[in-house]
Amino acid sequence: MMNKDQALIFELSKPGRVGHSLPELDVLEQPVETLIPAEFLREEAPELPEVSELQLMRHYTALSKRNHGVDSGFYPLGSCTMKYNPKINEDVARYPGFANIHPYQPEAQVQGALRLMYELQTALAEITGMDEVTLQPAAGAQGEWTGLMLIRAYHEANGDTNRTKVIVPDSAHGTNPASATVAGFESVTVRTDEDGLVDLDHLREVVGEDTAALMLTNPNTLGLFEAHIVEMAAIIHEAGGKLYYDGANSNAILGIARPGDMGFDVVHLNLHKTFTGPHGGGGPGSGPVGVKKELIPYLPKPVVVKDGDSYRLDYDRPHSIGRVKPYYGNFGINVRAYTYIRTMGPEGLRTVSEYAVLNANYMMRRLAPYFDLPYDQHCKHEFVLSGRQQKKLGVRTLDIAKRLLDFGYHPPTIYFPLNVEECLMIEPTETESKETLDEFIEAMIQIAKEAEETPEVVQEAPHHTVIGRLDETTAARKPILRYEKITQ
């Protein structure tokens, strides 16, 4: 018997079943052939599901129960900052003065929105130690690309057209080399040393007259603070390059350290991560970019400026790289981030990072006896473990991740960064209680013991989810992305 919770909505369909009633036609009925040219008409009716309203509700309610989000459970996805998104953000984003305006309205009619954008630009500049910020980029990767295009424009304006290479660490997010390529640069890899930090000697080897920039996350993707950042900045600047800050891990340093004070020239932030815009499920995101003074002329236009007591969009930017997104950024996400910043205040933001770092270190130390700890030092907001010892028992990191589903948890990031064997990257964020952390830790300890005593339990997981382990290789190579009715 078919499990109705697993059935496609097409499989619930019965001919003639109606899910909605339409009002009586109040215009003259005409054959569709007289209204639409024949070449645009289907020869057969589309195979749309015919279900009742109740069936429809039950079907999608059942599907929603199979989803996992921050509001439903712990989500320790490393390098993603899956923190709780305060619901006051949603209330403010729904204010009619924000939700019902149009980007083509006269500036005089949207002064509240322009003020919010201006004050958000100012706040982000202060938080990061930059001189000016654009809110246009739609997400982190576009922020990276925008920042690199600003660096390209700066070098070209100075006649420095031979700077074709961008340096990225071997532990970097994949978007870093991808953004460099899309921006027209060649990416060059710098190694990580035995302490999990950028190898300074190797950095000196790869830096040269063709270096446009070094892209860096600090703390890095291993969750470790690049303690030699000032020296690294000097190496890049002496070579004539720029230092780019990937803000993916900003949740570790709010109110404690600023990229601009470390020597960074360009910064992007992920407002949908650090500043509680909801994310997961495809967006939207927001990836503002901040720059130091010498790069301001190249920022995307327009930028919101303040004239006396009013605000306007400044298009008079002759050296701008132009727009990077239609209109003025993902405004709704920016409203949420602004609300979060105003709610927390400077001290609150600092506390966010202190708790994020505390939670990560607590989890790391409690789990270290059961999993390999590649870098045995204090971490920042996230940390990496290795499943090397479990691999020797026939249990892979993928198996551990699948087994966690049985406990109701979203797994951590796995097999990234690539320079850690059988990697698990865990980021608890500041919003989780000690009780939640302890429950997750106990689940991980149980899985470690199962790997030793009953490895098949882990190897065959998950056992309690609606759908068991999938053939992910076949799904990736031979995807079936649409429903097709098979007739005998």
Curated annotation (Swiss-Prot):
This is Probable glycine dehydrogenase (decarboxylating) subunit 2. It is an enzyme of class 1 (oxidoreductase). Keywords: Oxidoreductase, Pyridoxal phosphate. The gene is gcvPB. One of its GO terms (cellular component) is cytosol. Transmembrane segments: none annotated. Its cofactor is pyridoxal 5'-phosphate. HAMAP family: GcvPB. Disulfide bonds: none annotated. InterPro entries: GcvPB (IPR023012), GDC-P_C (IPR049316), GDC-P_N (IPR049315), GDC_P (IPR020581), PyrdxlP-dep_Trfase (IPR015424), PyrdxlP-dep_Trfase_major (IPR015421), PyrdxlP-dep_Trfase_small (IPR015422). The modification N6-(pyridoxal phosphate)lysine is found at K273. It catalyses: N(6)-[(R)-lipoyl]-L-lysyl-[glycine-cleavage complex H protein] + glycine + H(+) = N(6)-[(R)-S(8)-aminomethyldihydrolipoyl]-L-lysyl-[glycine-cleavage complex H protein] + CO2. GO terms for molecular function: glycine binding; glycine dehydrogenase (decarboxylating) activity; pyridoxal phosphate binding. Pfam families: GcvP2_C, GDC-P. The glycine cleavage system catalyzes the degradation of glycine. The P protein binds the alpha-amino group of glycine through its pyridoxal phosphate cofactor; CO(2) is released and the remaining methylamine moiety is then transferred to the lipoamide cofactor of the H protein. It comes from Halalkalibacterium halodurans (strain ATCC BAA-125 / DSM 18197 / FERM 7344 / JCM 9153 / C-125) (Bacillus halodurans). The lineage of its organism: Bacteria, Bacillati, Bacillota, Bacilli, Bacillales. The keyword Oxidoreductase applies. Belongs to the GcvP family. C-terminal subunit subfamily. GO terms for biological process: glycine decarboxylation via glycine cleavage system.
